[in-house]
Amino acid sequence: MKIKPLGDRVVIKMLESEETTKSGIVLPGSAKEKPQVAEIVAVGPGTVVDGKEVKMEVKVGDRVLTSKYSGTEVKFDGQEYTILKQGDILAIVE
């Protein structure tokens, strides 16, 4: 089974953030911010807004930066994913 997002939504898997600061301080789980770098695992077909087709600008495998608190977190087959709209993606990391 797999997740197939609808419209202009994408499914992402957050990538782990550093647990130690550059100066060597280890951060406890409660002090870490939600990671903002993710990998796209599924992409919806796009959508139509005001009669114009909105194409998807990202593809499976892209690494992206997301807004900190955007999307809906879901658990599927023992994995954690976030489903969000393409507009909540800030940039593609190359």
UniProtKB/Swiss-Prot annotation:
Question: Would you tell me the Gene Ontology cellular component terms?
Answer: cytoplasm
Q: Which GO terms describe its molecular function?
A: ATP binding; metal ion binding; protein folding chaperone; protein-folding chaperone binding; unfolded protein binding
SMART domains reported in the protein's UniProt record: Cpn10
CDD domains for this protein: cpn10
Q: Where in the cell is it found?
A: Cytoplasm
Q: Which UniProt keywords apply?
A: Chaperone, Cytoplasm
Query: What positions belong to coiled-coil segments?
Result: none
NCBIfam families xref list: PRK00364.2-2 (NF001531), PRK00364.2-4 (NF001533), PRK00364.2-5 (NF001534)
- HAMAP family recorded for this chain? CH10 (MF_00580)
Protein name from the UniProt record: Co-chaperonin GroES
In its UniProt entry, the species of origin is given as Ruminiclostridium cellulolyticum (strain ATCC 35319 / DSM 5812 / JCM 6584 / H10) (Clostridium cellulolyticum)
